[in-house]
UniProtKB/Swiss-Prot annotation:
The chain crosses the membrane at residues 13-35, 40-62, 93-115, 125-147, 159-181, 213-235, 262-284, 289-306, 318-340. It is found in: Cell membrane. Disulfide bonds: none annotated. Keywords: Cell membrane, Membrane, Transmembrane, Transmembrane helix. It is a multi-pass membrane protein. It comes from Enterococcus faecalis (strain ATCC 700802 / V583). One of its GO terms (cellular component) is plasma membrane. This is UPF0324 membrane protein EF_0922. Belongs to the UPF0324 family.
């Protein structure tokens, strides 16, 4: 009994330095967001984490805690997001908006996967890149990774790439949408909400347009989040089928049920309950508060764990992959918005 208690205390002390560091960066980001509202706390947390993690705040003693902050807090954030989403909310963007999101997500997944395979990335990394860009960035990657049995290195590399890509798009899409659509707020919001990776990036980017754009962009983003469960399930089945085919065990594998990660199931249950009974405002606001803090702390941890040296050691392939997927994703969105006459 004493040994288990000592192990627990020792484990806690190993986690605390990195976890507290990520939380302090999140607090500083929240404070700086007061003076830089156009960026937002989520964006600042990533950028500040990247800067500090590659300069002053470095050390192996932080790794375990930042890893917990990055993974576990994102998992809880996914569940809490479900309490702020309803199926009724989706109706506000209309059939036109639903069609845009469904086609945009499908094409993003297909092209991101094909580009990844063309550049000789593994199935896991190509699927993580596809899901992270199509759905909700790090949260989607955290949900998809266990379903396709991706390892920590694959997950970390793609989270880094997706967050870097999202940060670039977050700063450029408000300008691009203004040039293309002018005062057409719905089209600008659709481009931002239908393309950007994380919720924080959507809010930060839409804030650079105006407050109304935030509400509209989040409706498009919510639609993508609602489809997270379906994407995780389909990716898991796709990976199982490929594995089974390579091992000539397809029949045996298809008989086994695909267990979704607990936080994906939790998100779906919360979303259904909120759609049917509508959680009281105090519950939704409390959940949103904690979800926001969890996400910002996790984003700070992701930034702290982003090692530029390691990223550049991967070579030009990663840079080409990110730029290719980002370009295709934005071009597809622009073409779809034109075809659907937004």
């Amino acid at each position: 009994m004493k040994n288990s208690e000592n192990d627990y205390i020792q484990s806690l002390f190993q986690i605390l330095p990195g976890l507290l560091t990520a939380f302090l960066v999140a607090c500083l980001s929240k404070f700086l967001a007061i003076w830089l509202p156009s960026l937002g706390a989520a964006t600042i947390a990533i950028l500040l984490g990247i800067f500090l993690g590659n300069t002053f705040v470095r050390g192996a003693n932080l790794n375990r805690g930042t890893k917990v902050a990055e993974s576990k807090l994102l998992e809880f954030s996914v569940v809490l997001l479900g309490t702020t989403v309803t199926f009724q909310t989706i109706a506000q963007i209309g059939l036109q908006g639903v069609a845009f999101i469904l086609i945009q997500m499908s094409l993003t997944i297909i092209f991101a996967y094909l580009i990844g395979k063309k550049l000789a990335f593994s199935d896991n990394m190509s699927l993580l890149m596809a899901g992270g860009n199509a759905v909700c960035g790090s949260s989607a990657i955290a949900s998809i990774a266990p379903a396709i049995q991706a390892d920590e290195e694959e997950k970390g590399q793609i989270i880094t790439l997706v967050n870097l890509l999202g940060t670039v798009l977050m700063l450029t899409l408000p300008i691009l949408s203004g040039i293309l659509y002018g005062t057409n707020l719905l089209a600008r919001s659709a481009l931002i909400g239908g393309t950007l990776q994380s919720v924080g990036q959507v809010v930060a980017s839409a804030n650079m347009v105006n407050e109304n754009a935030v509400q509209l962009a989040m409706l498009f983003k919510i639609m993508r989040i609602v489809l997270l469960v379906a994407v995780v399930y389909l990716f898991g089945r796709f990976k199982q089928s490929k594995t089974a085919e390579s091992e000539a065990e397809l029949v045996e594998v298809t008989k086994k049920s695909s267990a979704l990660p607990w936080y994906v199931v939790g998100f779906f249950i919360a979303c259904v309950f909120n759609s049917l009974i509508h959680f009281p405002v105090v519950i939704s606001e409390t959940a949103h508060f904690f979800s926001s803090w969890f996400e910002i702390t996790a984003l700070a941890a992701i930034g702290l764990r982003l090692d530029f040296k390691k990223f550049f050691q991967e070579g030009k392939r990663f840079l080409i992959y990110g730029l290719s997927v980002g370009t295709v994703q934005v071009v597809l969105a622009i073409l779809l918005l034109a075809l659907l006459q937004f």
